[in-house]
């Protein structure tokens, strides 16, 4: 009886196997995942062109740890060197043009250490770890300080900056890179220097707020927290504050209806410089990962573009080039610049002009 049962069971298994084989298309294989890069990073984003070298400033004072990145109206890529204090630009052909050094005279004993850069209304705005927010006027060649203290205390080390559509300036101030008030307060902050000249602290938490960008629809402030390895999104309070009916409306973008935690970086990659494209995708530079990530408006990582020379410090980048659709990103340690064509144009165009958002 047991032998007969075994025969019947075997026939059943054989029949089921034949049915499954007939139901499958000829040559069909089990689905496989797409190629995965080092550290489990996603593949290249769709629509990305090949990466090519744009310039090499290694071995020069202007190439000592690259940061910043912004295009003027003539197509020049401006950048800074943290290690030497130089503010320079590359011509559209990739030729290096040193412009000005922001280090004070040696007798003052303090370096500048510039970080972020952004053009706005014909002037270059910069963050400096030790000198606060600087403005360079290309017409007069003057470099001056806009603001360097909050309530009579030095900033902790201003890092990056962006403007909203109304012309309000936002900048991050992480603890640990600049003079800093004291060791007991190791949190960072985000400030707004409003169009009317008022300085406000709009965020006072976060381990190390770094990159910062205002969304294409001017409703969100994205902040990259380098130490926490994630992004934060603050929704601007434009209309009535439902939690405070007696409070006035806030068209100046100085308060938030809410702040929420966003995407964690894959591979423990802390976010550095961040920029939106016109579709609302957020592009994020990550020094630990050595490249840039594309994240869609829902917070999903769409892909990763590595820097070709394995430079472990992709600090920042800028949209520019033909149709403002090329990303120029930096190898901070190697002193090299690379570029590739992105799927969509960047939100910030030449001279810091915000381009129209696309649905």
List PLM regions with ranges.
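Beta-rich, blade/repeat-based domains predominating
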Residues: 58-76, 104-130, 151-169, 175, ...
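A short loop-to-beta-strand structural motif that recurs across blades of beta-propeller domains
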Residues: 86-88, 132-134, 188-191, 230-232, ...
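Short loop/turn segments immediately following beta-strands, especially the blade-tip
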Residues: 234-248, 341-348
């Amino acid at each position: 009886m047991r032998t007969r049962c075994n025969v019947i069971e075997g026939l059943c298994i054989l029949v089921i196997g034949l049915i499954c084989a007939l139901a499958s298309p000829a040559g069909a294989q089990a689905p496989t995942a797409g190629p995965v890069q080092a550290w489990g990073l996603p593949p290249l984003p769709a629509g990305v062109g090949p990466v090519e070298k744009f310039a090499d400033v290694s071995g020069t004072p202007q190439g000592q740890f690259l940061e910043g990145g912004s295009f003027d109206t003539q197509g020049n890529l401006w950048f800074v060197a943290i290690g030497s204090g130089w503010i320079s630009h590359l011509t559209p052909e990739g030729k290096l043009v040193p412009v000005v050094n922001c280090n004070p005279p040696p007798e003052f004993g303090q370096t500048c250490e510039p970080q972020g850069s952004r053009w706005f209304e014909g002037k270059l705005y910069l963050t400096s770890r030790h000198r606060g927010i600087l403005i360079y006027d290309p017409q007069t060649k003057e470099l001056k300080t806009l603001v360097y203290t909050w309530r009579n205390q030095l900033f902790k080390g201003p890092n990056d900056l962006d403007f909203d559509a109304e012309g309000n300036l936002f900048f991050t101030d992480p603890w640990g890179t600049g003079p800093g008030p004291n060791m007991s307060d190791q949190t960072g902050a985000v400030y707004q220097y409003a169009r009317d000249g008022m300085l406000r602290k709009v965020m006072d938490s976060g381990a190390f707020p770094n990159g910062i960008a205002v969304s294409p629809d001017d409703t969100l402030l994205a902040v990259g927290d380098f130490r926490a390895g994630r992004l934060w999104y603050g929704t601007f309070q434009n209309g009535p504050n439902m939690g405070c009916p007696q409070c006035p409306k806030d068209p100046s973008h100085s308060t938030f209806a809410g702040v929420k935690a966003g995407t964690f970086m894959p591979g423990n990659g802390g976010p550095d410089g961040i920029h939106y494209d016109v579709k609302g995708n957020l592009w994020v530079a990550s020094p630990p990962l050595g490249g840039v990530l594309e994240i869609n408006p829902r917070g999903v990582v769409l892909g990763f573009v590595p820097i070709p020379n394995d430079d472990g410090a992709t600090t920042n980048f800028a949209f520019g080039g033909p149709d403002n659709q090329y990303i120029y990103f930096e190898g901070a340690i190697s002193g090299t610049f690379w570029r590739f064509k992105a799927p969509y144009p960047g939100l910030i165009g030449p001279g810091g002009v915000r381009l129209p958002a696309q649905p």
